[in-house]
């Protein structure tokens, strides 16, 4: 299938219904350990926790060798084998209520092809709207990048990170238990997150890869527990992978009506940057 054929997927839609069940929210709280503790029935779902719902549940026989569902259907069958959730832009209009049903409507908004250091790249922009009782609660755009295999990724060289005086910080130890639990929360069978020999020998990573959405959620958790204002928007961009080889640092810098967020690898480089927008 040529890139021209992929364009036929623009405008394709899907609709998924799910219960914002309490058990899944409790499992998320057990994994993330928010200071506020586990949520209760009919309480508002914390921001970004909607990523733990509306999950693709491909049958086992329809998984690719890397653990991803085979492409086609809603997502175009782009042949490049490497996939990355590269970024997102989200508006929070109303909180989802735990214990109540919801509906997510998706649409393929754009597909573009570019060239990078590893060869051709395909960018797929997916739009989502989440409704509960016919009220629009969340709007989201996700950027998914597909690429050819590249050169092996070297392990970052740890350095002593300088102290930061203008930010709230947290150090995260990304051990395999955390990565496994997050994969379970998101029903994500991609082997780079739990199968070390596969991650190293098949995809060329130095260790298990930390999920980009996990880093984004951890940054959101840091931000939301250091503000009393409502969170109305969030955006993030992945810049470099993180691995389970060493701790990484989260930083949150309040800046007027927003909070600037950053995840730094053990080498001090920015792995993911994000922004929280605050309401009145």
Swiss-Prot record:
Root EC class: lyase
Molecular function GO labels: (3R)-hydroxyacyl-[acyl-carrier-protein] dehydratase activity
The keyword Oxidoreductase belongs to this UniProt entry's keyword annotation: no
Mitochondrion keyword on record: no
Domain of life of the native organism: Bacteria
Annotated control of activity: Inhibited by 3-methylfumaryl-CoA concentrations above 0.3 mM.
Family: Belongs to the HTD2 family.
Protein's name according to its UniProt entry: Mesaconyl-C(4)-CoA hydratase
């Amino acid at each position: 299938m040529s890139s021209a054929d992929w364009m036929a997927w623009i405008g394709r839609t899907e609709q998924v219904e799910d219960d914002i069940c309490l058990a899944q929210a409790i499992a998320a709280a057990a994994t993330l350990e928010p200071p506020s503790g586990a949520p209760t029935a009919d309480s508002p779902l914390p921001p970004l926790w909607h990523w733990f719902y509306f999950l693709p549940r491909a049958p086992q026989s329809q998984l690719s060798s890397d653990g991803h569902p085979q492409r086609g259907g809603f997502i175009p069958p782009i042949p490049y084998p490497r996939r990355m959730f590269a970024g997102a832009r989200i508006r929070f209009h109303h909180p989802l209520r735990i214990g109540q049903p919801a509906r997510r409507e998706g649409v393929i908004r754009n597909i573009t092809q570019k060239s990078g250091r590893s060869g051709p790249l395909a960018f797929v922009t997916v739009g989502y709207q989440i409704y509960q009782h016919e009220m629009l609660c969340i709007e989201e755009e996700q950027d998914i990048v597909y690429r050819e295999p590249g050169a092996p990724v070297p392990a970052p060289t740890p350095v002593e990170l300088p102290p930061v005086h203008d930010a709230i910080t947290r150090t995260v130890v990304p051990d395999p238990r955390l990565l496994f639990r997050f994969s379970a929360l998101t029903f994500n069978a991609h082997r780079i997150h739990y199968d070390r020999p596969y991650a190293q020998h098949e995809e060329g990573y130095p260790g298990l890869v930390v999920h980009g959405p996990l880093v984004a959620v951890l940054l959101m958790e840091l931000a939301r527990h250091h503000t009393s204002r409502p969170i109305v928007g969030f955006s993030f961009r992945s810049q470099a992978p993180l691995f389970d080889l060493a701790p990484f640092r989260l930083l949150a810098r309040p800046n007027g009506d927003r909070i600037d967020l950053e995840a730094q690898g053990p080498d001090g480089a920015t792995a993911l940057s994000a922004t929280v927008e605050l309401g009145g």
